[in-house]
């Protein structure tokens, strides 16, 4: 929550002078928990208000009614955590409805769309949307350059890499380091020796395991481009402490 939800809301509230938010997500625990944290932060820390909140079943493909509500309520920001195939329908229908995410008049911030999802959505249908992630394929650093090159050599030039893919890549390397520190494959010993494990070869940059077994990482905001990639607009100068359920937000 600290790295993806709170950091992105702080940024957009300042950068876009946003005060009103419309929360939309798929109907399961992650979007609901994320939006509970988002609502608390918006109302109690940013001095803003939530003008709408809607959830849709997984696989839902008809968003015309909520798009009409968004038009009517004119929020400064649509905060989206729609997942899976529903993303294809949602963003294509936004585009068809004339809601232009490249304009200053309509801001959409997603915590659930990576380069992988854009393959299905189509870059032209999501251009201008803002995404909050720790990793984007376009990151300009030697670690990522080597990672992208190796990934495409294995999976083809058309393959893309999103935040979740990079996380899956990091997992075994972090586990390997923890096993070596523990000198054992025993689960409890590996858990005990995990906090403090560092990795300076991660495509996203240097990361470190926190006491809660999440990763210290930089938060990043990027803008979706028509070619399916993201242009990074902002990243925190320092690693952010990971906290999935910050005190006062439960």
Question: What residue spans do the PLM features occupy?
Answer:
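Extracytosolic ligand-binding ectodomains
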Residues: 1-250
